[in-house]
Amino acid sequence: MLEIRFVRASPDVVKADLERRGTPEKIAWVDEILAKDARSRELKVQTDELRRRRNTIAREINEARKTGKDAAPLLREAAELPQKIKANDAEQEEISGIIRTRLMRLPNILHESVPKGKDDTENVEIRRVGTPRTFDFELKNHGQLAADNGWADFERAAKTSGAGFYFLKGGLVMLDLALQRFALDLLGKKGFTPVIPPFMIKRDSYEGVTDLDDFEKVMYKIDGDDTYLIATSEHPIAAMYQDEIFEEKDLPLRLCGLSPCFRREIGAHGLDTKGLFRVHQFTKIEQFVFCRPENSWQIHEELLANAEEVFTKLGLPYHVVNICTGDIGTVAAKKYDIEAWMPRENAYKEVVSCSNCTSYQAASLNIRVRDKENFETKHLVHTLNSTAIATSRALRCILENYQNRDGSVTIPDVLRQYMNDREFL
């Protein structure tokens, strides 16, 4: 979320950002926040004065009694003070809740390089890497190919779990595991520490890391509990250091999360028939970094370079796009996507999302770094995240781009060391 002191100091910046995003209807929220904030500070002054008065009035009552003065007015005032304090505290608590809710629904401040656009059709291509392969035979749908070869079972998964699930089998299991090891090894050489996080997270922690609308659209809630299955390891890793203070020497902290990811929202995008691309459950390796604010933009480019290296070494053509104002969402200040080439559709499809969230998540989670020059001064850290690889999407890429006429699939060179030097599925 945005910090109240930032909104208080720079309301025009927030309003201009909302205009740039194409959400001018939220500008009224800024004025509401400022009005509530002014009332909250006024109440604090009043309540502090009431508490000071409560401390002094007891002495005045004793003094009046000692000197024979009428203490009745003081006694009446003393009797009223607790109720006034209680009423002020209740109003301030209510106002604080309203302010926090509004702050959490205001989006992050966009970086100046984010392109203006209404939706994903206006994202801006930065570069293309690799040359798409030409085929002299008709490609099979990746899901059909997997089913025909006994590498996946979508029909029985639909029977046991519903649409959007799959049983992965045989060689495709080994290929999935090879992708995981490849990505972990690559990131390990770059100083990332692997983390397997909890696969469930409490709502109060989850609220600090994602768009509140996702609770209705994306996440699976555990019945009878205020707990959710994670949509990505980014979320529990971001909340891992909630309410903690880093020392400068400990940053940047580079972590790579390995986890299943659970998402409800695929129906809104259209589900591939017998496919691995849009599913309710998949495995993902996620890059995550906590850093000092002055380093975050450089690290953002590093995370993108790491993800590009994954797909370059896999020999999969892709392009990088700069996500526009109408597609970027609430949390990121800037976001890149990598979209890999899908030859059956003759199109690029998203396989990586790489975001700099600046201080937005840290403000919600209260994660700070101590200033080494001034021990008492603490600043919000910046958080960044990027897919390294979502294995189900990478599997689709490989099944299409490396498909052979006889129905076999060539295993990318870089993965063969993890598959006993096997060349084909």
From Swiss-Prot:
Instruction: Note one Pfam family from the annotation.
Output: Seryl_tRNA_N
In alphabetical order, the GO MF annotations are: ATP binding; serine-tRNA ligase activity
- Establish whether keyword Nucleotide-binding is in the entry: yes
List the pathway annotation. Aminoacyl-tRNA biosynthesis; selenocysteinyl-tRNA(Sec) biosynthesis; L-seryl-tRNA(Sec) from L-serine and tRNA(Sec): step 1/1
Q: Where in the cell is it found?
A: Cytoplasm
* E.C. designation(s): 6.1.1.11
**Key word Nucleotide-binding present in the record?**
yes
Task: Recite the UniProt keywords alphabetically.
Answer: Aminoacyl-tRNA synthetase, ATP-binding, Cytoplasm, Ligase, Nucleotide-binding, Protein biosynthesis
Q: Where along the chain is ATP bound?
A: R263, R264, E265, V279, E350, V351, V352, S353
Which InterPro entries does the protein's record reference? Answer: aa-tRNA-synt_IIb, aa-tRNA-synth_II, aa-tRNA-synth_II/BPL/LPL, Ser-tRNA-ligase_type_1, Ser-tRNA-synth_1_N, SerRS_1_N_sf, SerRS_core, tRNA-bd_arm
Subunit info here reads:
Homodimer. The tRNA molecule binds across the dimer.
| Assigned protein family | Belongs to the class-II aminoacyl-tRNA synthetase family. Type-1 seryl-tRNA synthetase subfamily.
The role this protein plays is: Catalyzes the attachment of serine to tRNA(Ser). Is also able to aminoacylate tRNA(Sec) with serine, to form the misacylated tRNA L-seryl-tRNA(Sec), which will be further converted into selenocysteinyl-tRNA(Sec).
Quote the protein name from its UniProt record. Serine--tRNA ligase
